[in-house]
Curated annotation (Swiss-Prot):
Name the record gives this protein: Glutamine transporter 2
TM stretches of this protein: 5-27, 31-53, 86-106, 121-141, 147-167, 186-206, 218-238, 268-288, 302-322, 326-346, 368-388
GO molecular function: aromatic amino acid transmembrane transporter activity
Membrane topology according to the record: Multi-pass membrane protein
Pfam annotation, one family: Trp_Tyr_perm
A biological-process GO annotation: amino acid transmembrane transport
Species this chain originates from: Aliivibrio fischeri (strain ATCC 700601 / ES114)
Membrane as UniProt keyword: yes
Family under the similarity heading: Belongs to the amino acid/polyamine transporter 2 family.
Amino acid sequence: MNFKLFGSALILSGTALGAGMLAIPMVLAQFGLFYSTLLMLIICAGTTYAALLLTEACSKTELAFGINTVANKTIGKGGQLVTNALFYLLLFCMLIAYILGAADLIKRIFSMMNVEMSIEFAQVAFTLFASAFVVCGTQIIDKLNRLLFFFMISMLVLTLIILIPGMTVENLSQVTNHDKGMLFDTSTILFTSFASMPVIPSLVAYNKEATKQQLRNMVILGSIIPLICYLVWLYAVVGNLTANEITHFSNISDLIQTFSAKNEYIEIILSIFTSLALLTSFLGVAMALYNQNKDMISHNKIVTYVCTFILPLLGAGLAADQFLSVLGYAGVILVFLAIFIPLAMVVTLRKKETEEVHQNLHIYTAEGGKLALGLTLLFGLLLLISQI
């Protein structure tokens, strides 16, 4: 087993697997498990192929450490400007959200231990702690992420051990909403749960000695792990509660509180899981932004650090809770970044490439030809329609 590639797949998974996973049953339970599972499989397939397209663009663009260089060498200056603007907007939104979420969680954990802490101090402490690992490079993040991911999956397994005995066939077969239009509207929410594209340029550069088959397997494994976790969690929650109960929860805390009444340890376990999910997501996104800043702005570590961590930290302090409403637009930004831009890059590259490219063992080309590209375009358009 190639542990470097396996670790890279876990970085992909850790970036996609966020605390938002806990909310998936609240969105899908009402539609029943059959259609929820089908939609999740379609979204996973679409995002995985789009990730493979970006992997192709990165592997065919030598010495590209960030999406800035990849865009410049594929879709020109205009495309590069659009890509960078969307990329920065998305990553800043994501980092601010993770800082806000992590700080709130840290404050709550310390309150349980009767230690009072201001939210501002918690934000600074989390950012300084997590950023220390990011500046050490992709190799350190890879090794740390493997450890964090192991503990995160362990917490999920413990939760399932507690929940599985309470599952009933009646709950698993329930459907309270037959409106397929409303189900379709949840597509973008699920899409953001599978999106790990910001880290792909860094991981392709990190695994520059990998063969094209290894790069493909890295992306596929990094997509399948979140899919399995989401489905298992969805089935466990739906099997224990009625759809009406789940859909009436206003936030994740209500869900956790309901399960806490059944088992006193589940609140602690899910709090640990949420903490680890936030940290792994932060590390992946921060790594992508840090490498992007090195690639685009400066190789000076101080300048890069300020642009990567201090600006989102200031944003978290200024925006506070109301900023979370802006994250609703992140799905639209992500459709362009994760679907349309990789598609444009690959179409441009394939027009220029020679037979030598196909014979090179280290240059990856996504399978499927023009049909797969057309289906990817349709997938992206449908995601945009679901937002209207």
